[in-house]
Structure formats: C-alpha cells, structure tokens
Amino acid sequence: MSGGSTGERPFSDIITSVRYWVIHSITIPSLFIAGWLFVSTGLAYDVFGTPRPNEYFSENRQQVPLINDRFNAREELDDLTSNL
C-alpha cells in the first residue's frame, strides 16, 4: 500500500488562508497581553507562591539564608525561620 492522503489539509494551505490569519491576529496578541498583565500586576507571585522582590529579606535578617551543615539542616532551618 502506498502512502496515501490522511485527509488533513496541508500546512501550506492553512497558513496562507485568510481565516487562519483573522483568528491568529487576535489570539496571539491577546495571549501576549494576558501574560504581560499576569506578570506586571503581581498575580504571578501570588499564584506560584514566590516572594516579591522586596520580600526576600526581612528587617531582622539581611543575610542570605544558607544551610551549611547537611547533618544539622533541621536545626539550621529552624534558626533561619524562627524570625519570620
């Protein structure tokens, strides 16, 4: 059996059609604007639970919270989070 048609439209026909560009001239900029608003309004910080740039360091603790001893990590973690 030779390679026959799958019944799908060729990609070149799709991207040269007016219908494709009418739909995508609206959806592509809309997705870009939605993503920009998602990040610029700070909603991305809330959804993913990441701290905002001004929340990385508290007033009491200005050093980077590093764990130095892996065998006593629980104690170091408790010390680092006790001021939060």
Swiss-Prot record:
Keyword Ribonucleoprotein: no
Pfam family, one: Cytochrom_B559a
SUPFAM superfamilies: Cytochrome b559 subunits (SSF161045)
Cofactor: heme b
GO molecular function: electron transfer activity; heme binding; iron ion binding
Subcellular location: Plastid, Chloroplast thylakoid membrane
PROSITE patterns: CYTOCHROME_B559
GO-annotated cellular components: chloroplast thylakoid membrane; photosystem II reaction center
Signal peptide (residue range): none
Listed transmembrane segments: 22-36
UniProt remark on cofactor binding: With its partner (PsbF) binds heme. PSII binds additional chlorophylls, carotenoids and specific lipids.
Chief place of localization: plastid
Residues at which heme binds: 24
Coiled coil: none
Keyword vocabulary terms for this entry: Chloroplast, Electron transport, Heme, Iron, Membrane, Metal-binding, Photosynthesis, Photosystem II, Plastid, Thylakoid, Transmembrane, Transmembrane helix, Transport
InterPro entries on file: PSII_cyt_b559_asu (IPR006217), PSII_cyt_b559_asu_sf (IPR037025), PSII_cyt_b559_CS (IPR006216), PSII_cyt_b559_N (IPR013081), PSII_cytb559_asu_lum (IPR013082)
Stored PANTHER family: CYTOCHROME B559 SUBUNIT BETA-RELATED
Binding partners and assembly: Heterodimer of an alpha subunit and a beta subunit. PSII is composed of 1 copy each of membrane proteins PsbA, PsbB, PsbC, PsbD, PsbE, PsbF, PsbH, PsbI, PsbJ, PsbK, PsbL, PsbM, PsbT, PsbY, PsbZ, Psb30/Ycf12, at least 3 peripheral proteins of the oxygen-evolving complex and a large number of cofactors. It forms dimeric complexes.
Recorded family membership: Belongs to the PsbE/PsbF family.
General function of this protein: This b-type cytochrome is tightly associated with the reaction center of photosystem II (PSII). PSII is a light-driven water:plastoquinone oxidoreductase that uses light energy to abstract electrons from H(2)O, generating O(2) and a proton gradient subsequently used for ATP formation. It consists of a core antenna complex that captures photons, and an electron transfer chain that converts photonic excitation into a charge separation.
Full protein name: Cytochrome b559 subunit alpha
Source organism (scientific name): Cyanidium caldarium
Gene from which the chain derives: psbE
